[in-house]
UniProtKB/Swiss-Prot annotation:
LRR repeats lie at residues 60-91, 153-180, 182-206, 235-260, 275-302, 327-352. Residues 364-412 form the FBD domain. Signal peptide: none annotated. This is Putative F-box/FBD/LRR-repeat protein At3g49480. Gene3D superfamilies: 1.20.1280.50, Ribonuclease Inhibitor. Disulfide bonds: none annotated. The lineage of its organism: Eukaryota, Viridiplantae, Streptophyta, Embryophyta, Tracheophyta. It comes from the Eukaryota. The keyword Cell division does not apply.
Length: 449
C-alpha cells in the first residue's frame, strides 16, 4: 500500500503586494527591523527605503553591539522617500563622543536619480525630534537645518547647542519644543523664534542644573497661540533678582501654561484673547495677574501665593472654570473672595493637601452676600483631599447649600482618612438641600468644557 506523503509548501503571499501596502506593513515594526527586510529577497531590497517615518532610538542591545550609530549613518545614505513625515533620533548616555549624528543628518540627500540632491533638512522633513543625552559637549545643528522649508514640528532635547546663523528661515514651522537645550548666547532663541512666521505652539523647558546662557527668555511671536514654559531656580552668581527671566509679547495667545519657581521674574504683556491659564507660580506679580482677567479657564497652584495678587483683578468676567491647589487652612475664606469675583463660574475644583492635625482652626466668617456664581451659574463643584476639619466642613456646606443650579458635586477623602472618619462625609450629603447628590469619592479634578 503506497503511503501518501504530504509536502507543505510555504507560499509567499506578501511579496506580491504593491509597494504602498508593503510600506504600511513595515511602519508597524521598529525602523531597524524594517531595514533588515532588505536581506529577504530582491523584492524587499528597496521597500524599506521608502518609509515616510524613521525612528532611531538607542536601546541596551544597540549600545553593546554599537549597531545604532552604524545603522543611523548607513540608512541615511540609502533612504529614498520623497518626504519624511517624521524623523526621530534618540541617543542615550552610551553614545560615543567620537561620533557626530548631526553630520549624518546633514549629509543625507534627497532622492533624485543622481543621488546628489539637496540636503534632507532642506527639502523633505515635516517632523524632527532630536534627543541627545551623551556625555560629550552640546553639539550644533547643521546650518541647513535652519532653512528647512518643509519642517512643521521640531523637538530639540538636552545636549543640543542652539546656534542660529544671521539669516534663518523656517517658514512652515508650527510647533517647537526646546527641552533643556543650551543656547549660544542671549539672542539665539530670539533669532530662532523670529524666523517662524506661522509658529502656533511653543514649549520651553529650562534645566536648573545647567547654565543655558540665557538670562531673559523673550517670546515675541505674533502668531503664537499656546505657550508652555517650565523652569526652576536658575540664579547665577551675577544674577540680578529684579531681572525678568521670561518676557512675552504674544498678542494672539490663547493658552498659557507656566511652571516657574521664580514667578516674580515674569513680564506678561497685554493678551486680550487669552482663554486658558495654568500656572504654579511661587511668587506671581501684579503684572502677571492682570492679563488673567479675560480668561475662561484658570488653574492656580499653589493658591496661597496668588491671594495677595487677587486684588489686582476686580472681576473675572469671562471665567467659566477654575481649579486651585490649596495648602493652607487660613486661606479658606479667600476662596469665597475669589468666587465673588467670578460671576459666571460654572465649574469650581479644589485640590487640597492641608494636614488635618496640629492646626488651630481659623475663624471663618460667612459672607454677607452670596457670590453670584453660586446663586446663578455653578454646576460642578469638587473637593479632593477632604480631611473633615470643622472649618473645612463649613465652607463646603456653604457652597453646597447656596449653589442653586448645581448638577454634580464630588468630594474625595484624603488618602490618610480612616474608615471611621469617612463616616463624617455622610454628614455633607445630609447637609445638601438641593436635589443633587454628593458623590463621595468621584472628584475628577479636570476641566470639563
Amino acid at each position: 500500500m503506497t503511503e501518501l506523503v504530504e509536502h507543505r509548501v510555504c507560499e509567499d503571499r506578501i511579496s506580491s503586494l504593491p509597494d504602498d501596502l508593503l510600506v504600511k506593513i513595515l511602519l508597524c515594526v521598529p525602523t531597524k527591523d524594517a531595514a533588515a527586510t532588505t536581506f529577504l529577497s530582491k523584492r524587499w531590497r528597496f521597500v524599506w527605503r521608502m518609509l515616510p517615518r524613521l525612528n532611531y532610538i538607542e536601546t541596551t542591545s544597540d549600545v553593546k553591539s554599537n549597531t545604532v550609530w552604524w545603522f543611523l549613518e548607513e540608512s541615511f545614505r540609502f533612504h529614498k522617500a520623497p518626504l519624511l513625515e517624521r524623523l526621530w533620533i534618540d541617543l542615550g548616555p552610551q553614545c560615543p563622543i567620537n561620533v557626530n549624528p548631526v553630520k549624518w543628518v546633514a549629509k543625507a540627500r534627497a532622492p533624485p536619480a543622481s543621488n546628489v540632491g539637496p540636503p534632507l533638512l532642506d527639502t523633505r522633513v515635516r517632523w524632527l525630534t532630536f534627543r541627545l543625552l551623551w556625555k560629550g559637549e552640546p553639539i550644533r545643528m547643521p546650518k541647513s537645518f535652519y532653512f528647512c522649508k518643509t519642517l512643521e514640528r521640531l523637538t530639540l532635547s538636552d545636549k543640543i547647542l542652539v546656534d542660529v546663523p544671521c539669516q534663518v528661515s523656517l517658514p512652515s514651522l508650527r510647533e517647537l519644543d526646546l527641552f533643556c537645550v543650551v543656547y549660544k548666547d542671549e539672542d539665539s532663541h530670539v533669532k530662532l523664534l523670529s524666523s517662524c512666521p506661522v509658529l502656533k505652539h511653543l514649549k520651553v523647558t529650562r534645566n536648573r542644573r545647567v547654565e543655558d546662557n540665557v538670562r531673559t527668555f523673550r517670546v515675541e511671536v505674533p502668531s503664537l497661540l499656546r505657550l508652555d514654559y517650565k523652569a526652576g531656580m536658575m540664579f547665577r552668581e551675577d544674577s540680578d533678582m529684579s531681572d525678568p527671566f521670561l518676557v512675552t509679547d504674544t498678542p494672539n495667545l490663547l493658552s498659557l501654561h507656566i511652571f516657574d519657581t521664580v514667578g516674580y521674574s515674569l513680564s506678561v504683556w497685554y493678551m486680550p484673547h487669552l482663554v486658558t491659564v495654568v500656572t504654579d507660580e511661587l511668587f506671581p506679580s501684579e503684572k502677571f495677574m492682570r492679563p488673567l482677567s479675560s480668561v475662561k479657564y484658570l488653574a492656580l497652584s499653589p493658591f496661597d501665593t496668588m491671594v495677595p495678587w487677587c486684588d489686582a483683578v476686580n472681576n473675572y468676567s469671562r471665567l467659566v472654570e477654575c481649579m486651585i491647589h490649596l495648602s493652607e487652612y487660613d486661606l479658606l475664606e479667600s476662596l469665597l473672595v475669589l468666587l465673588s469675583k467670578c460671576s459666571k463660574l460654572k465649574v469650581f475644583l479644589v485640590d487640597s493637601d492641608i494636614p488635618r492635625w496640629n492646626h488651630d482652626p481659623a475663624l471663618w466668617n460667612q459672607p454677607s452676600s452670596i457670590p453670584r456664581c453660586l446663586s446663578s451659574h455653578l454646576e460642578i463643584f469638587e473637593w479632593d483631599g477632604y480631611v473633615g476639619r470643622e472649618d473645612e466642613k463649613k465652607i463646603i456646606r456653604y457652597i453646597l447649600e447656596n449653589s442653586k443650579y448645581l448638577k454634580t458635586a464630588g468630594i474625595s477623602p484624603n488618602s490618610t482618612f480612616s474608615g471611621e472618619e469617612k463616616q463624617k462625609m455622610e454628614e455633607l450629603e445630609s447637609m445638601h438641600r438641593t436635589p443633587t447628590s454628593v458623590l463621595l469619592s468621584s472628584a475628577r479634578m479636570s476641566f470639563r468644557y
